[in-house]
UniProtKB/Swiss-Prot annotation:
Residues 309-518 form the Helicase ATP-binding domain. It comes from Saccharomyces cerevisiae (strain ATCC 204508 / S288c) (Baker's yeast). May be involved in the preferential repair of active genes. This is DNA repair and recombination protein RAD26. A motif (DEGH box) lies at residues 469-472.
Length: 1085
């Protein structure tokens, strides 16, 4: 009672001291539910409209057939000749069996889908049965168990059992808790004390200032760093095992601690023995996980380890596509440690990852399984300085140059002898590091650029495992890094990626071709057999048979890849994660900010924007800077003034101050994210010197200028020491950074694409977090920030491409500019109905308070706060309600809208229930899918039988495996997709048992022989024209004029472009087409 009274008194005191304004508190749950229902209804209505249009076309076609039948019937009744009567009867019979029955079946299928869509609209498109932990509608038991981490992607149940041979062991909850505590103690003992040896200088940020907003570290920057390394040979500071003495000391310490001084009768080394107090978990007689690791894994992580072993047994790889924060790194390390513990790790392991997480990989290996030798192949690695005995003098260099081949060294090499000597010394260190790992084991860590630079050395090695972290970097099948990765000599390949399927089948092919070369055939075969039917089935004007064929091909493709892709999300498996609350805190403008804002709204610059004479983004950027801090506008002239960045001129900074002081009293740690270093500079001065009230707060800072070598140390300090706030840029918070020491997050200037901010959120709300996490996005009420944010809420459900596709120029329309470039209208909602709905549920958020929640009444009364609104991420909410089947099919079909256009799985099944064997459409859709799979199998056999591992698969431009030398390349290119569609036509003719010469009357049908011949002739004309041009180049207009093709609609443009792409490449710089080399021969046709 006394504690409760003290808490209440503290709340009253805070309210009295902070209370300025009363504001609206808006419920996140009601806002999400209302908008989600609105947009789902909108999407269903759009799908319903497409289906009704398709139904109308089918009814029109039916009426034509009926009229024709009636006409033939009248002629039959009026004629007297027996031969004519028989001919008319045959025509009527064929018309009824081939055309009328087919259209009637189309109408029946379409009406079934329309009925389902209308039911969803009538019910408000409520997602029933999508509660966490429950099986969802349309989901099989196997899909449910895979999604929740109960079974592997191959359908096998968790098969680990505790190895209790020769010991008494009770498998109960109490014993499990003891195992967990002992394993945790073992992990603590495994930690190194390297951070204690770092000086304060390691944590000082660079004083260099940049004119540009922070940009994500790219490959070119890392490439320059590694190229410099080859000549400078700067010693690294990371405590990896490139220093053999360090590894031996660490190994000796671990052996001593783990054995606990007990007598061991076995002759096996310590890493092969079970823990003296924690039993191993064995899957079979060969594969065991060390007890101290197994005890710390979540159930779904144990399932992943078993799945990786199943892949190992099949001599192939897989993709771990778990959502960010579920411990993909730990699952891989646990598996490799189990291989080592079981005596199955007989070769080296290569880890390829972004430079920012190399040290984290090293730390995690040393933490979870210390006996593994882990070496970083980078300037930060200690191996670059571990052997200074090798020094080349001038005489050695001169002898080497004189005795070498002329092509080995140039005159410049001899002239710049110092640089050449350092390069050779550095190369010696690299060779020695690689040889050490290959000879003695175990782990070599490098970057994607490092793999490319040192490919001459790394591609020669026979690796037991190759792991690509952030493996979607190889999604472009023709990029140099993709081809390099696919040359690695190992069958055991693992990709880690939180976004393995991103609505692009070609990218999906590239990833799978790495983990299982040839599984999906060559890229041209894959595109012909799957991409074309799936894409055609997604068109709004697709016929019923095209819709079903596309869906069945997607299902067939899903069945091919699903065993090798493991994808789980937090909502399904991480039941023990604490609650997360996301809110938008709307701040007020200061008087100075308001005057600056209005000044721009009345400026000539805005007039130019509204008249289309200036880029819209120019004005938006100015207003966003004003919302953050108006001094950013005149940074070049004011940054040296003492009052630059004055916190009193920023409403957001005043809110930040009160939040940090409030959380400091409560003992909470906070992460403060902003998008640019300029704003981060202002915030750092604000906390360190500009405001005396904040001077007692301890903080750290990390941005793009922070040396990669020191980033992990900063993270460890923040998690383990008494810091109040960590200042970070949104991007550098980055991949794999674990900041679970914080349970409060402020995103100072949210990105317009909310998914970008998810990286920042996941730093704290992830496995290992024990407390409730609150995330606050700061926006200025009534400003351009709020206006765009509320537009996003609705548009987010319609399509994700608006924000991610640079070709979408229509996001900002001219007629919207007046509303965007205004101040006020703080409601921000698109409809009054939505506003009333939110107001009605205002109290919901207040009632959701827990012991670790912030007092929302207190927050909205902070000085400078206009209102509090729960953050809405509709995409994430809807994603959590999907089955794994939905996610995979959606990715294959190219997005959610296409999935809804095609139909749900239930709709396909139900619409064909009870249909007879004469259902031509269903049979042909299935046949196309089966033939597509068979084509892949045939292509795969050619790849796997004829080529060794490490031979890149033919992509149509690069690669060797599976490439077919064509005698008639033009002809073969033509028959690819046409063959698929032609088979359906052929089967329809067989089903009617009589050949028919009549085309399908609705004009949207599959390829006929006439169309194929027309396309062949067009292609030959295009090739002949380009053959005569200079450099085989011509513009699109010239090509069309020369061959006399008329384009009547968009479909004609798509067809001609598709034909052009088969024999020519588009040159973006010259804006025209260049004929492929294989068609430049006069005999190519």
């Amino acid at each position: 009672m006394e504690d409760k009274e003290q808490q209440d008194n503290a709340k009253l005191e805070n309210n009295e001291s902070l209370k300025d304004l009363g504001v609206n508190v808006l419920s996140q749950s009601s806002l999400e539910e209302k908008i989600a229902n609105d947009v789902t209804n909108f999407s269903n209505l759009q799908s319903l409209q497409q289906e009704e249009t398709r139904l109308e076309r089918s009814k029109t076609a039916l009426q034509r057939y009926v009229n024709k039948k009636n006409h033939l019937t009248r002629k039959l009744n009026n004629t007297t000749r027996i031969s004519v009567k028989q001919n008319l009867r045959d025509q009527i019979k064929n018309l009824q069996s081939d055309d009328i029955e087919r259209v009637l079946k189309d109408i029946d299928d379409i009406q079934s889908r329309i009925k389902e869509l209308k039911e969803q609209v009538d019910q408000g498109a409520e997602n029933k049965g999508s509660k966490e932990g429950l099986q969802r509608p349309g989901e099989t038991e196997k899909e449910f168990l895979i999604r929740t981490g109960k079974i592997t992607a191959f359908g096998h149940k968790a098969g680990f059992s505790l190895d209790t041979a020769n010991r008494e062991y009770a498998k109960n909850d109490e014993q499990k808790d003891e195992d967990f505590e002992m394993a945790t103690e073992q992990m603590v003992e495994n930690l190194t004390d390297e951070d204690d040896n770092l000086s304060d200088q390691d944590y000082q940020m660079s004083g260099k200032e940049s004119e540009d907003d922070e940009e994500e570290e790219n490959d070119d920057k890392i490439l320059k760093e590694l190229e410099d390394l080859r000549f400078r040979g700067q010693p690294g500071e990371a405590k990896d095992d490139g220093d053999e003495l360090y590894y031996q000391e660490r190994l000796k310490k671990w052996v001593k601690q783990r054995s606990c001084g007990s007598q061991r009768s076995s002759d096996l080394p310590e890493w092969r023995r079970p823990h003296p107090n924690i039993p191993d978990a064995k899957l079979n007689s060969q594969f065991k996980i060390p007890g101290e690791i197994y005890s710390l894994l979540f159930n779904y992580q144990k399932t992943c380890v078993q799945w990786l072993y199943e892949l190992y047994q099949q001599n192939c790889g897989g993709i771990i596509g778990d959502e960010m924060g579920l411990g993909k790194t730990i699952q891989v390390i646990a598996f490799i440690a189990a291989l080592h513990h079981s005596g199955l790790l007989t070769g080296p392991v290569l880890i390829v990852c972004p430079a920012t997480v190399m040290k984290q990989w090293c730390n995690e290996f040393q933490h979870w399984w210390p006996p593994l030798r882990t070496v970083i192949l980078h300037s930060m690695g200690s191996g670059m300085a571990s052997d200074q005995k090798f020094k080349m003098d001038e005489n050695d260099l001169e002898n080497l140059i004189m005795n070498s081949k002329p092509s080995d060294f140039s005159y410049e090499d001899w002239k710049n002898s110092t640089r050449t000597k350092k390069a050779l010394e550095s190369s010696y260190h690299l060779d020695k590091l690689i040889d050490k790992v290959v000879t003695d084991g175990h782990i070599l860590i490098t970057t994607y650029v490092g793999l490319r630079i040192h490919s001459d050395k790394l591609l020669k090695v026979k690796w037991q495992y190759a792991v690509l972290d952030e493996g979607h970097k190889i999604r472009n099948p023709d990029s140099e890094i993709s081809l390099t990765c696919k040359k690695l000599k190992t069958h055991n390949r693992i990709i880690l990626s939180g976004t393995p399927i991103q609505n692009n089948l070609t990218e999906l092919w590239s990833l799978f071709d790495f983990i299982f070369p040839g599984k999906l055939g060559t890229l041209p075969v894959f595109q012909q057999q799957f991409v074309i039917p799936i894409n055609i089935g997604g068109y709004a004007n697709a016929t019923n048979i095209q819709v079903q064929t596309g869906y069945k091909c997607a299902v067939a493709l899903r069945d091919l890849i699903s065993p090798y892709l493991l994808r789980r999300v937090k909502a399904d498996v991480a039941k023990d994660l604490p609650q997360k609350k996301e809110m938008v805190l709307f701040c007020k403008l200061t008087k100075y900010q308001r005057s600056k804002y209005l000044e721009f709204l009345h400026s000539s610059d805005l007039n130019q924007i509204q008249n289309g004479k200036r880029n819209v983004l120019f004005g938006i950027d100015i207003l966003r800077k004003i919302c953050n801090h108006p001094d950013l506008l005149d940074r070049d002239t004011k940054r040296h003034n003492p009052d630059y960045g004055d916190p009193k001129r920023s409403g957001k900074m005043q809110v930040v101050k009160q939040l940090l002081l409030l959380w400091h009293k409560q003992g909470y740690k906070a992460l403060l994210f902003t998008q640019s270093r300029q704003m981060l500079d202002i915030l750092e001065e604000f906390i360190s010197t500009k405001d005396p009230d904040l001077s007692h707060l301890n903080y750290l800072r990390m941005d793009g200028t922070t040396n990669i070598k020191g980033r992990q140390s900063l993270v460890d300090r923040f998690n383990n020491e008494s810091f109040d706030v960590f200042l970070l840029t949104t991007r550098v918070g980055g991949l794999g950074v674990n900041l679970t020491g914080a349970n409060r997050i402020i995103i100072f200037d949210p990105d317009w694409n909310p998914s970008t901010d998810m990286q920042a959120r996941e730093r704290a709300w992830r496995i290992g977090q024990k407390r409730e996490v609150s995330i606050y996005r700061l926006m200025v009420g009534g400003s351009i920030e709020e206006k765009i944010y509320h537009r996003q809420i609705f548009k987010q459900f319609l399509t994700n491409r608006i924000l991610t596709d640079p070709k979408q120029k229509r996001f900002f329309k001219i007629h919207e500019l007046h509303d965007l470039f205004s101040l006020g209208g703080e409601n921000g909602y698109s409809t009054e109905e939505l506003n009333e709905e939110v107001q009605k549920h205002t109290e919901n958020l207040k009632n959701s308070k827990s012991e670790e929640s912030d007092d929302f009444e207190q927050l909205v009364n902070l000085s400078g706060v206009s209102k509090l609104e729960s953050f809405y991420n509709g995409k994430e909410k809807k994603e959590n309600s999907k089955t794994e089947d939905d996610r995979l099919i959606e990715g294959l079909l190219g997005g959610e809208s296409n999935l809804e256009t095609v139909m749900s799985h239930d709709s396909v099944v139900n619409s064909h229930a009870g249909s007879s064997s004469s259902n031509i459409i269903t049979k042909e859709a299935s046949r196309v899918a089966i033939e597509a799979v068979n084509a892949l199998r045939k292509s795969r056999k050619k790849i796997t039988k004829q080529y060794e591992i490490g031979t890149p698969t033919w992509t149509g431009r690069f690669g060797k495996a599976g490439k077919i030398r064509k005698r008639d390349p033009l002809k073969n290119k033509l028959t690819g997709s046409a063959a698929i569609l032609g088979n359906i036509t052929k089967s329809q003719k067989e089903a009617s048992k009589e050949a028919r010469q009549e085309n399908y009357d609705d004009g949207i049908t599959f390829a006929r022989s006439k169309e194929i011949n027309s396309n062949t002739k067009t292609l030959e004309n295009i090739r002949a024209y380009l053959q005569k041009q200079n450099n085989f180049f011509s513009s699109s207009v010239s090509i069309l004029n020369s061959i006399g093709v008329s384009l009547s609609d968009k479909e004609d443009v798509i067809k001609v472009r598709a034909l052009l792409k088969t024999i020519a490449q588009f040159d973006k710089e010259r804006k025209g087409w260049v004929l492929d080399e294989e068609f430049r021969n006069n005999n190519a046709s």
